[in-house]
Amino acid sequence: MEQQKIPQATAKRLPLYYRFIQNLSLSGKQRVSSAELSEAVKVDSATIRRDFSYFGALGKKGYGYNVNYLLSFFRETLDQDDITRVALIGVGNLGTAFLHYNFTKNNNTKIEMAFDVSEEKVGTEIGGIPVYHLDELEERLSTDIQVAILTVPATVAQSVADRLAETNVHGILNFTPARLNVSENIRIHHIDLAVELQTLVYFLKNYPQ
């Protein structure tokens, strides 16, 4: 896939398409229309057709899309056969929930280890994942760990991000309110649950359905 030719908005929707197509395949469905996809993933059909057009002819007019072909295509496009090993830093309530969940519906993403400073948690396993002391971060992060989930207090988020920048980590999923400064070779996605909730409430009040 030639990433530079695909808008980031399209790239963000690809996992959404893939998950739905997986479910279709498991149900035995052989083909699907853009209208059916639109209804399921809540993306208008014109956008879906435009997204798919970046990859060439994925379907046929009047027929729709072959489910097995789409499944195979997106599996390869999203590198689903490659395991992405993840480290989690911050084993509070949210971090603990992640460890128990550990992407059970996504077989190619696994949290391999976690880090915290709590004496009660360091040296234990949560959801089968070992918890190490934060002091061991650089030592424990092997070259296989390229993604980190950050669920630490906002006050220490930047310092942890600075330490991650000295490892082989190239992607950070930041669940803290802090807006982090990282080097250009690290991609960071910010997910502020409080902001998301405020946005939802605003839309409920100002854009009633």
Swiss-Prot record:
Q: Does the keyword DNA-binding apply?
A: yes
* UniProt keyword terms in alphabetical order: Cytoplasm, DNA-binding, NAD, Repressor, Transcription, Transcription regulation
Q: Which GO terms describe its cellular component?
A: cytoplasm
Q: Which GO terms describe its biological process?
A: negative regulation of DNA-templated transcription; response to redox state
Which molecular function GO terms apply here? DNA binding; DNA-binding transcription factor activity
**Transcription regulation recorded as keyword:** yes
Pfam families in the cross-refs: CoA_binding, Put_DNA-bind_N
Q: Which residues are involved in binding NAD(+)? A: G90, V91, G92, N93, L94, G95
InterPro entries reported for this sequence: CoA-bd, NAD(P)-bd_dom_sf, Rex_DNA-bd_C_dom, Tscrpt_rep_Rex, WH-like_DNA-bd_sf, WH_DNA-bd_sf
Subunit and interaction comment: Homodimer.
> What role does it play?
Modulates transcription in response to changes in cellular NADH/NAD(+) redox state.
HAMAP family linked to this entry: Rex
State what protein this is by name. Answer: Redox-sensing transcriptional repressor Rex
Q: Tell me the organism.
A: Bacillus thuringiensis subsp. konkukian (strain 97-27)
